[in-house]
Amino acid sequence: MPSTYSDDNTLRSGLDRFRDHSPSQHRRSMSQETDSTVSTTSIVFDRIQERLDTKEFPARGTDGDDNDSLKDELNNDDLETGPFLGNASPSSRSNQRSSADGQRMDRSLRRWLFIVSGALVATWVIGLIFFVSSKAYKPSSSFAHDPQATVTHGSGKKVTLDQVLNNEWRAKSHSISWIAGVNGEDGLLLEKEGANKDYLVVEDVRAQNPSSVEASKSKTLIKDKLFEFANKTYWPTVTVPSRDLKKVLLATDVQNNWRHSYYAVYWIFDVETQQAEPLVPYDADARLQLASWSPTSDAIVYTRDNNMFLRKLDSDKIVQITRDGSADVFNGVPDWVYEEEVLASGVATWWSEDGNYVAFLRTNETGVPEYPIQYFVSRPSGEEPKPGEENYPEVRQIKYPKAGAHNPIVDLKFYDVKRGDVFSVDISGRFADDDRLITEVIWAGKQVLIKETNRVSDVMRVVLVDVGSRTGKAVRTVDVNDIDGGWFEISHKTKFIPADPANGRPDDGYVDTIIHNNGDHLAYFTPLDNPNPIMLTSGDYEVVDAPSAVDLQRNLVYFVSTKESSIQRHVYQVKLTGEDMTPVTDTSKEGYYAISFSTGAGYALVSYQGPNIPWQKVISTPSNPDKYEHVVEENKDLAEAAKKHELPINIYGTINVDGVELNYIERRPPHFDKNKKYPVLFQQYSGPVSQTVKKTFAVDFQSFVAAGLGYICVTVDGRGTGFIGRKNRVIIRGNLGTWESHDQIAAAKHWAQKDYIDEDRLAIWGWSYGGYMTLKTLEQDAGQTFKYGMAVAPVTDWRFYDSIYTERYMRTPQTNPEGYESAAVTNVTALSQNVRFLLMHGVADDNVHMQNSLTLLDALDQRSVENYDVQVFPDSDHGIYFHNANRIVFDKLTNWLVNAFNGEWLKIANAQPNGMKRRALPTA
């Protein structure tokens, strides 16, 4: 869905995909983590401490509730009472002078006062010495970051917007490119541009363990960063080794297409000769949409101009697999909506493990209506305009199925490499062409598991195809209306479990996430056609984007879960029998973890993301007898910065709305004073299955609002969001905007009753779905609670958004017209009851079209509603980055909010002309 200023403080170019993101996962970053896409073995192996001293960053304090008791604090001015809003009234200070100021004081009285004053000073000094020596007080700079402090002392530096926008508060993090060894060795990874090393090297983590006798030696794949061909020099952007590590597929001249996809020139690099040749023989400039290795390392399949081709490495001959590719027919790559909402990838090609078959999607979007994206300043196509058309905008027509419109027709095809033919397998009971979504394809030996749903995502079928016999059958059919009336979320984490009778697995199977116990849980289906699983997890919690990995040697499944808390993430392991579920991470302490496993699941990169300063380390998994641990990242610079700055006071808790416990975080100014009245900015995303309240380390825009501007910033995850049970999630089905806005209004009323809140200065803001929810909340509230709002790139009518995302939650406009009408932002009279609101949108937004904002503006015009401001950004997509636009967005948000809380918008509501100054007449 719309990209959002997301829960992980990341700004992405698409509505957040609604698991932990918006409809289309969050992308670009103002995030607190930065992924180094380059493999990080150099960091793992070069001069790294043996252990990470996490005691340096202990978690202290407890979760706050609504009536937390606060210690008295230093009353340093925040911007709440400082230069933005003016200081305290002079009447609060004495402005009277004694009438005896000019009189002389009796000498003995002065002597007596001097003695008493000296005694008092001496007493104060002695007390101060005792106070300091007892360590009852420390300046803020002497503490490591405490994310759960309820008070802050000291006078450190202020958090600035520039720091946030320049990513100075972003935690460093790294990704590891795990690969399997030629003979299946575990623990190998790719290292690119390591210190004092060749450009691309295969390393073995076990080499750093003196007790390991199985460690492989380093292997150089590419010596130099640059390579030459036909007297031209090239620099690879993408490097993908073959499974046998004898060749490397390189991509140069990469040009982005949509969120995930790109065009590039591809090369085959020979490791032995260190020479490259074009993937397409005799055409070194061929721009391809996709290229991928055969698992047997002897062939590459690629897509060019929407047709698929095969090149076997033992010859220059190219085999054309499909011939019907066109502007409307895609082979092996997805169209816009499948890339954005289904696959979350630019890849729709899947090799069988034996290299004998290629499965691929054929997408026909002939019947899908087009939407024009206009570029007024740039020309993303790279093409020069035709003579006489230099002053016209470039227009890109994209096939974009809006809710209720024709969807692309998608079929799964198979290419038999040995026979050289393409075939499909018809299975009885399949969904009709315009009612079918193919959401996941998993090779299971010589068979294929295919997940498909109807277009509104409430009926799912799992189909099993035997490519040898070219037959198939449905092995599972689930109607979610029989469970809770919700929907199926798309997952790409299903794991094939091959049979291993000697290891207790007599049949093939697979591990999948299913609906169970009011949430998402792991299930093991074996044999492949068995619809009745072994439950691996169950209980009042959920698994997250699971499974993470499977250790086939030890029959273990690894996964991330909310078992400890809905706003924490810990890693666990469980046997394929469903027994012995144990934590991998330390559950005795609060934590939010992510994890990346080696190909055999014997090693992992553990990423601690909060609430303390983030860190990373590579470990051996608990069942691996070859024990190993190395720190990758400690973020010492970030820890030092946290010591030297006044960060907001983060209070976590829950509020009860209609009997449902909703998570919140309240960010307070560093010198919070319970005797003051603070304005409040509510920030939310609120999209289905999203989560914004998390126990992660973050110094983001919301932190700046609290620590830099001195306001309170609150986030509440209402109903419809994730990880508080499906019952509270699926209530929004067919009625987007109703319950989410209700919960935001209820939360605002809850805060308005607090003694330290200024109930007349409440604002709400959000991006993407959060922008929609801002407008919907202002509409539903009609100025009763919220006075101000700031909406960026909002949906205003779900009939304008893409079919696959929207219909999952709303069904179709044809079957739910009342729901769509109710969900749209149409009551502009109610919007006029707010003091003022701000609307911003990127003109070239291919995700949430500017049509949404323009339609709302027209409705405002028709009703003569004028209490709003508008900013548009030429050539910016959903992330709003083009030509410095992102900085302007946050500058505008900041200044607009300060003016709102300063009362400036009240002054212009009924603007009146000032009296005219009398012109001075010239004197004679």
From Swiss-Prot:
Cytoplasmic side stretches: 1-111
PROSITE patterns, alphabetized: PRO_ENDOPEP_SER
Compositionally biased tracts (Polar residues): 1-12, 31-43
GO function term, MF aspect, one: dipeptidyl-peptidase activity
Comp. bias regions, Basic and acidic residues: 14-23, 47-58
InterPro entries according to UniProt: AB_hydrolase_fold, Pept_S9_AS, Peptidase_S9_cat, Peptidase_S9B_N, Serine_Prot_S9B/DPPIV
Segments traversing the membrane: 112-132
Biological role: Type IV dipeptidyl-peptidase which removes N-terminal dipeptides sequentially from polypeptides having unsubstituted N-termini provided that the penultimate residue is proline.
Protein name: Probable dipeptidyl-aminopeptidase B
Organism annotation: Neurospora crassa (strain ATCC 24698 / 74-OR23-1A / CBS 708.71 / DSM 1257 / FGSC 987)
Record lineage: Eukaryota, Fungi, Dikarya, Ascomycota, Pezizomycotina
